[in-house]
Amino acid sequence: PGLKEEYDRLAVEMIRRRKEGNGFNFFHFMIDLEGGPCVAKRLSGCGSGTEYLAVTPWGDLYPCHQFVGNEKFLMGNVDDGIVNTEIRDEFKCCNVYAKEKCKKCFAKFYCSGGCAANSYNFHGNINDAYDVGCELQRKRIECAIMIKAAMAEMEEEQNEEK
């Protein structure tokens, strides 16, 4: 709850400073309401286990760096390639449509179901959604939209004055 309140305070401060001509950006509040996130990322997030792999210094392959060392997620090695295709297939199905909590969430196409590693570490399942991450992501999107609305209002007022 405290972090969400701080996001609100930051958004209000960003609006105030932009009105004064001294604006700044915060990556998590940067949102494109017209184009949105790239299409591929809307469904499956980062692409762990399917679009990229983590390679250890010993040549072991894991779906992402956060799974390195967890033998359950060892996919293979650079010499033999991917030998555990079940893990790859599990990550192929890791998307907003596989996560029950995402189905009715307004933010699903901005977070794409969140981080598989966080879901696994929190729930023991990559196809669940990491609740804390979801709550914070939704709040960041709300703040981003609030900033966009305030800036549009400010621009409209400036145009009326001309």
Name these PLM-found stretches.
Residues V68-K162:
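Flexible mid-to-C-terminal extensions adjoining Fe-S/redox cofactors in radical SAM and related proteins
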